Amino acid sequence: MRYCLKSRQKKELLAEADEIRVAARDYRQAVDLMEEYPAARIIVDIDDLDIKWSILQALNEKYPGRLTLCLAVGDVLEEFKNFEYFFSFYLNTWQDLNSAVSLGVNEGFIGAPLFFQQDKIKERYPNFKVRAIPNRAATGNVARADFAHGTWIRPEDTEFYEPYVSCFEFASPSAEIEETVYKIYKRREWRGNINVLIPQLDYNTNNQFIAKEIMPTRLNCNQTCETRNSCHLCDTALKWQATIEEYRRQKEEKRTVKSTSMVTD
């Protein structure tokens, strides 16, 4: 698995990164990053066209194959055509993916329900590089009834996604949180509450007790929990473990109350 970190991260971590993502406002920073991290691919966010294109064009010519643009706009304009690029928004349907590929895009973020058809994506577009944000359960403007049906990936499940997903990057409000989440996913193990790692899930569940065997099912399940209201393997697994955790908590509280009462008596 490849890992992408934001350019404002610590230098020692950027030295480990396979890819470094530069915010649009910091696009000039790409010049130094190319030289400081020669093994890394540099991805520059493009939110609008108010930048000095000659800088990026010069970098693209000097370091062929190392500069990629991440476009927040869906229209492919003349300025983009000499660069490798993908879109910052999710491709959720076959129409989204087909349209992107027809524009020359060969990688991108895949959202639901397409996320749950990894084998079909690989079969139809074997050279398309799927990107994922594993600690984000879902995106979009519509409220979700249950984020368990979303596109989250646990650290332990990385091995199942490696044949399909090329790169992980992380949803993180700060460099410190990104560092922590990155290290957990690179270690491929998390022994704490899954809600701490993937906040949208909102399940008080100890991650290490979630059955690993059920997770490969998510790869190609077609999200039947939503399309046919069937399966519900993911939310059942999370709720079951959360119920066990609550039972243990209540049992421990009763034990504590009883011990305190005995001491008082």
Annotate the PLM regions.
Residues 1-96, 103-265:
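Active-site pocket-lining/capping segments in soluble small-molecule metabolic enzymes
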